[in-house]
Amino acid sequence: MSQGQAIAIFGDQMATELLEVTSDIKRIDQGGWWAVTQTFEGNFAAYRFAHVQPLDDASLRELQNSQGLVQDSGIPVASWKSSMTAELYRHAVNTIRQDIARGWVYQANLCRILAAPLNADLDVIGLWRLLRANNPAPYLSALLVPAADAGLESDVRIVSASPELF
């Protein structure tokens, strides 16, 4: 099920009006604003957008009104599962701090997996808004490309809560 128009939100920029979808990496050298994806298997896709604007509250309200989006993702908080308990996470952080103090490492990335059952019609931008309100990662992003807009078999739906630049 497709939701609204194609949109890409990366950091403090919002892009709309999908112009092109390609799997040819050379196309991005020809200019424009592109959202680029690559799967773990190495499949590349790029989505070129016509309109890019700063992300602000007014543009978010306009987007919500134009797409009929809800305020949240519709995923009950209790349904989220973590690969680590809070106690295990704190222990891992303390272990890393000790290893840094000993000089054994100078940087470590502690990761955990959060998972929840998702409906096929998940409001991607609603999930992005929920993450933005509760986990303000500096490079929070979302990409929604309805299949009908891009000639694809299925929608592209990506939400990332990355603390690091892409």
Residue ranges and their predicted role:
Residues 1-166:
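Extended alpha-helical targeting/anchoring segments
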